[in-house]
Amino acid sequence: MQNKISRRQFLQVTGASAAALLLAGLPVEASAASGHLTVTPDTLVSDLRADPTFAASGVWTWQSAVDSPDTPEAGTTLSDYVGANMAQDSADALNYLADTYEAGTQVTYKVYSPEEIAADATRDGVELYYWPSEVPGSKFVVVMSGNVLNNTANMSEGYATAWRLHQMGYAAFVLRYRVFLKAKDNAPVADLGNAVRFITTHAGQFNVQPENY
């Protein structure tokens, strides 16, 4: 049975900051059960981005989403990058995405159609990252992390929150939305609305409830 989540629990899960709506020197470790890098809080961000599975999956591995993504200094670990309090949940979330992708399930989805992107190139980076529920016909949650200004905080608030919600039985989606110079005319709000439309339109594919989400 799928657990219900109270407002208080949601704020605890998200750290109240999925707002706007939701050591070095260690060897690179490959998972024994899969071909991808096993992400831990001590994994170097550079190793994560160099991993073929993560690169092929299309998963966004940045925090800021301004015109030029932030580039951590050499030797920056996941814990350094997202914060120690979110590092383990972020690592677990990333490993699950990689496992899901390697098992043959798409985990990255464009929110806008090719025609919509052709009409407005800023829509091209608007994406959903998908943690399937293990409960058929589950409810879904769209996590919109960051400050809706210049930082989507996907790698910290977004993925950590999605992982906790996934563990509660929900299908979780993290939205990468437009920020900074691309966020004109209430673009983040439009991105959220279109993300929900995309999920409900493809509810059968995602095996989620198209209503009461």
For the regions a language model picked out, list residue spans one by one.
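Gly/Ser-rich "nucleophile elbow"/oxyanion-hole loop immediately N-terminal to the catalytic nucleophile
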Residues: 198-213
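C-terminal segment of N-terminal export signals and the immediately downstream linker at the start
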Residues: 3, 24-47
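N-terminal cap/lid segment of alpha/beta-hydrolase-fold proteins
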Residues: 78-135
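Short beta-strand element of the alpha/beta-hydrolase
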Residues: 138-146
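Cap/lid segment of the alpha/beta-hydrolase catalytic domain
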Residues: 146-157, 174-187
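Short acidic-hydrophobic catalytic motif
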Residues: 37-77
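N-terminal secretory signal peptides and thylakoid transit peptides that target proteins
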Residues: 2-18
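Short amphipathic alpha-helix adjacent to the substrate-entry channel of hydrolases
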Residues: 156-173
